[in-house]
């Protein structure tokens, strides 16, 4: 018999469905879906099937045997659903979505996710859209197929009944046998007898499509209640190094080797069960937080009880039952709640009674949880694990109760000691009363006289004592205080005034004599102010009384006005240190002299001019011949 492709048609339109037929049909007049090695689909009629077979016979089909388990592990990084392969519903007019596997649906809408030889080649190469070559399709069929695709295509990541009942059957391997040149597509009924032999389908391929793996088995409602609460097992194929399929003794001799993923596998995750367990855990943590807020004083007992809760949770995790976890966490939460103790005699009795009640409550809750689990159909080994975990919980509770008793005793003793101190607090000294400020108080109180009060005129007054030649005010605070508050201040003021008046008169006489000498000789001679001051000081003692009587009240100019003050000190300046003036005068009076000069003191042919005591110049004197 000629080898020809088999058509798998799952459309719900008026066409015949191939699952009702028990034999593989070879249709020469109808169209066939042919998957080329380049992942492109070509439309060919039944009359050209022989040419198609010749093309496939010329191609080299010797390909490397893929390691499907490794490639499925790669796909786990990309797929986020409950299955490592996407849910794909293929019809006569639908296009396959991107993915390595192709699947079909039965009339009940349950995806079979059947992997055949063509899907393995698609798994190795880039995906390409599947096209139909049926020319006799009418517009009604296409419209019905579109409606069916829109209804049956589930969204990626959605948890539905199809996702829960999804079962990945074993993937076919590409054999290196050159006799099987054509691509075989298994029918939905999954017969393995005569058609497999006629179409050169290997026995390994035929064994995969048994009644257990067919669509009819998925259409049946789940008999056991386990399918409703637990997700279906993910079955993964395995291969040996030589390409043969390994067999699992648990599945039988006729079935190929299948690996059943363990419950700890990341593929077999139930979204609803995990959400329920998380909700229960959040409730238990909220109850613990409420207990902590009610009794914040006993922190040590709370920490130990929380550690016991975590230990009990770790022991119970082997059974993986959320009901038992809830019961144990509630019992531990009830153990956390403290009971206040009043006296030392009632502490021990109250602690013993509370411990007994806690143990009874915990034992009752755990036994009730075990009874519920046994009624639900739990096994004997889970009950044994629960009993072992109960013994460990009791041991931890005993240790916790011992530690709690010691901590409660310490806290109660500390409270008893602190009570008398709280009843009789120390009396604080009353704060001094401060009268509120009033407006009338400022007027009633008499202002005290200041210790020092100095008047410094900043403007031109009768006396220009503080004015500089530039009009700036200069004063010395210490001298002002001495002048005003010194016991002999009046006498000192009179002496100062007399000195100043004498200096003013002397300056006037000297200015008049200088003008006369200018007219006579035409020479400008500058007077030494220091010598004048020394001579005047000697004359003040004898003429103090007469000078004061002859002073005129008229304003006079500054005594140093009109003199060349470059390089000279202002004697009247209060800020100038007089000690420096005295030092210069002493240096000039010594024999060594202050200035370094080499040469005759008087030039040849000149006379040294001498100055009299009254300030007049004397002609003649020593002549240097």
UniProtKB/Swiss-Prot annotation:
Keyword presence, Transit peptide: no
Compositionally biased spans, kind Polar residues: 29-39, 113-135, 155-164, 363-381, 404-415
Chain intervals with Basic and acidic residues compositional bias: 136-154
One GO biological process term: chromatin organization
Disruption phenotype: Abolishes localization of HIR1 and RTT106 to the HTA1-HTB1 promoter.
Modification sites for Phosphoserine: 47, 49, 435
UniProt keyword annotations, A-Z: Chromatin regulator, Chromosome, Nucleus, Phosphoprotein, Repressor, Transcription, Transcription regulation
Biased composition (Low complexity): 11-28, 83-105, 305-321, 330-355
InterPro entries from the UniProt entry: HRD (IPR014840)
Compartments (UniProt record): Nucleus; Chromosome
Residue span of region Disordered: 1-164, 295-437
Chief place of localization: nucleus
GO CC terms: chromosome; HIR complex; nucleus
Note: Present with 238 molecules/cell in log phase SD medium.
Family: Belongs to the HPC2 family.
Subunit annotation: Component of the HIR complex, composed of HIR1, HIR2, HIR3 and HPC2. This complex may consist of one copy of HIR1 and HIR3 and two copies of HIR2 and HPC2. The HIR complex interacts with ASF1. Interacts with RTT106.
Function recorded in the entry: Component of the HIR complex, which functions as a histone chaperone that cooperates with ASF1 to promote replication-independent chromatin assembly. The HIR complex is also required for the periodic repression of three of the four histone gene loci during cell cycle as well as for autogenous regulation of the HTA1-HTB1 locus by H2A and H2B. DNA-binding by the HIR complex may repress transcription by inhibiting nucleosome remodeling by the SWI/SNF complex. The HIR complex may also be required for transcriptional silencing of centromeric, telomeric and mating-type loci in the absence of CAF-1.
Record protein name field: Histone promoter control protein 2
Gene source species: Saccharomyces cerevisiae (strain ATCC 204508 / S288c)
């Amino acid at each position: 018999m000629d080898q020809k492709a088999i058509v798998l048609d799952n459309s719900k339109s008026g066409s015949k469905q191939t699952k009702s037929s028990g034999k593989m049909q070879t249709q020469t007049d109808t169209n066939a879906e042919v998957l080329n090695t380049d992942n492109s689909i070509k439309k060919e009629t039944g009359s050209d099937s022989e040419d198609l077979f010749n093309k496939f016979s010329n191609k080299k089909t010797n390909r490397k045997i893929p390691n499907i388990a490794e490639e499925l592990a790669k796909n786990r990084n990309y797929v986020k659903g409950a299955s490592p392969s996407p849910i794909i519903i293929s019809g006569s007019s639908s296009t396959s979505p991107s993915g390595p596997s192709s699947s079909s649906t039965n009339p009940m809408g349950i995806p079979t996710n059947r992997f055949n030889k063509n899907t393995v080649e698609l798994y190795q190469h880039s995906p390409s859209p599947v096209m139909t070559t049926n020319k006799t399709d009418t517009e009604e069929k296409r419209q019905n197929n579109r409606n069916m695709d829109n209804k049956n295509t589930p969204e990626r990541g959605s948890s539905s009944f199809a996702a829960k009942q999804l079962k990945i059957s074993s993937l076919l391997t590409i054999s290196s046998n050159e006799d099987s040149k054509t691509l075989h597509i298994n029918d939905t009924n999954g017969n393995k007898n005569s058609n497999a032999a006629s179409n050169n389908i290997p026995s390994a391929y035929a064994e995969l499509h048994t009644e257990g793996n067919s669509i009819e088995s998925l259409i049946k409602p789940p008999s056991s209640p386990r399918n409703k609460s637990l997700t279906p097992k993910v079955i993964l194929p395995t291969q040996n190094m030589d390409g043969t399929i390994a067999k699992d003794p648990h599945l039988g001799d006729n079935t190929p080797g299948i690996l059943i993923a363990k419950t700890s596998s990341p593929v077999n995750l139930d979204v609803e069960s995990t959400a329920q367990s998380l909700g229960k855990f959040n409730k238990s943590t909220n109850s613990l937080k409420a207990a902590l807020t009610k009794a914040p004083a006993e922190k040590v007992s709370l920490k130990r009880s929380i550690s016991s809760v975590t230990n009990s949770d770790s022991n119970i995790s082997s059974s993986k039952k959320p009901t038992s976890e809830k019961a144990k966490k509630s019992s531990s939460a009830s153990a956390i709640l403290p009971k206040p103790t009043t006296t030392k005699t009632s502490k021990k009795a109250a602690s013993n009674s509370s411990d007994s009640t806690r143990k009874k409550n915990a034992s009752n809750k755990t036994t009730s949880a075990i009874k519920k689990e046994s009624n639900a159909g739990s096994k004997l080994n889970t009950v044994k694990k629960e009993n072992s975990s109960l013994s460990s919980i009791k041991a931890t509770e005993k240790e916790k109760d011992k530690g709690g008793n010691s901590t409660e005793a310490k806290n109660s003793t500390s409270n008893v000691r602190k009570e008398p101190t709280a009843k009789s607090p120390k009396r604080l000294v009353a704060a001094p009363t401060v009268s509120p400020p009033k407006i009338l108080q400022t007027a009633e109180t008499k202002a005290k006289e200041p210790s020092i009060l100095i008047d410094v005129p900043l403007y031109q007054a009768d006396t220009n004592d503080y004015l500089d030649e530039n009009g700036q005010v200069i004063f010395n605070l210490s001298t002002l205080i001495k002048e005003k508050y010194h016991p002999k201040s009046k006498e000192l003021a009179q002496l100062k005034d007399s000195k100043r008046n004498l200096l003013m008169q002397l300056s006037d006489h000297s200015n008049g004599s200088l003008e006369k000498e200018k007219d006579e000789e035409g020479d400008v001679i500058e007077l030494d102010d220091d010598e004048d001051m020394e001579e005047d000081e000697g004359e003040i003692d004898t003429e103090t009384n007469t000078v004061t009587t002859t002073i005129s009240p008229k304003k006079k100019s500054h005594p140093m006005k009109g003199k060349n003050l470059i390089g000279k000190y202002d004697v009247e300046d209060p800020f100038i240190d007089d000690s420096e003036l005295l030092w210069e005068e002493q240096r000039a009076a010594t024999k060594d002299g202050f200035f370094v000069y080499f040469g005759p003191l008087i030039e040849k042919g000149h006379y040294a001019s001498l100055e009299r005591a009254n300030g007049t110049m004397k002609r003649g004197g020593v002549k240097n011949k």
